[in-house]
């Protein structure tokens, strides 16, 4: 039983880590610069998330870890749903309506998220 558990952990942990840090799935050649309003925000780890409407579709937005956003002066109130934000980021290569944000400006403050 102990061997099975060790084998499971050895196989599962790298898979989870690779999925979590799959930044190569974003198209860094296609930079999106958007003026938007989030429709929802999740201030949580391992990364904050938000949703917004862009080109008539609902997009999932991947932010930075909460500790990094807070250390750089970003607060949940600054990006609350309905508030205007400017985003610079990359869309997914597979066409999924999701983008990874590199830079966010809210209430006149620009924050580098990566």
Enumerate the language-model features and the residues they cover.
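OB-fold/S1-family single-stranded nucleic acid-binding modules
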Residues: 92-114
């Amino acid at each position: 039983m102990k061997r099975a558990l060790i084998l499971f952990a050895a196989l599962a942990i790298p898979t989870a880590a690779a999925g979590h840090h799959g930044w190569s799935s974003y198209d860094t050649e296609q930079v999106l610069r958007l003026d938007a309003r989030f429709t929802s925000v999740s201030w949580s780890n391992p990364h904050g998330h938000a949703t917004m409407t862009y080109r008539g579709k609902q997009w999932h937005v991947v932010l930075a870890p909460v500790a990094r956003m807070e250390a750089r002066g970003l607060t949940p109130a600054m990006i609350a749903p309905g508030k205007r934000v400017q985003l610079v980021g990359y869309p997914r290569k597979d066409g999924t309506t999701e983008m990874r944000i590199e830079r966010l400006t809210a209430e006149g403050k620009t924050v580098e998220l990566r």
